[in-house]
Regions:
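Envelope-exposed proteins and targeting segments
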Residues: 1, 6, 28-30, 71, ...
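Short, solvent-exposed beta-strand/turn patches at coil↔beta or beta↔helix junctions
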Residues: 1-23, 39-45
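Generic alpha-helical secondary structure signal
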Residues: 7, 18-19, 28, 50, ...
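Structured segments of extracytoplasmic/periplasmic soluble domains
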Residues: 21-31, 58-65
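Periplasmic OmpA-like peptidoglycan-binding domain that tethers envelope proteins to the cell wall
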Residues: 37-116
């Protein structure tokens, strides 16, 4: 899920992807942490804030689509610290302006068995 330069709004082209993620999380008993990232343009401090706004924007959209709030266990802001592509090119920077999801399966509590 990628973002335009200096933006945190989600493009409508990603709505179906977010709905699919919501369904996957619910059907497979996962909870998630949403992790925001930026390219390297701008100050480190500004980019941490922008990456947080991106993650919060995704959280809000998932909740709007009906995901239970307790499925989202964290928001992380990485700023420009974890690029997946070079920041030396326009294309690379576009790839770095993203949000990722860390999924963890919830533990299921076994039902007690009554002895008769």
């Amino acid at each position: 899920l990628n973002f335009d330069f200096d933006k945190s709004n989600i493009k409508p082209q990603y709505y179906d992807l977010l709905k699919n993620i919501k369904e996957f999380v619910e059907q497979n008993n996962y909870e998630m942490t949403i992790v925001g990232h930026t390219d390297s343009i701008g100050s480190n401090q500004y980019n941490f804030g922008l990456s947080r706004r991106r993650a919060e924007s995704v959280k809000a959209k998932l909740l709007e689509f009906g995901l239970a709030e307790d499925r989202i266990v964290g928001i992380e802001a990485m700023g420009e610290e974890q690029p997946i592509a070079t920041n030396a090119t326009k294309e690379g920077r576009a790839q770095n302006r993203r949000v990722e999801f860390k999924l963890v399966q919830r533990e299921t509590v076994p039902m007690p068995v009554e002895n008769k």
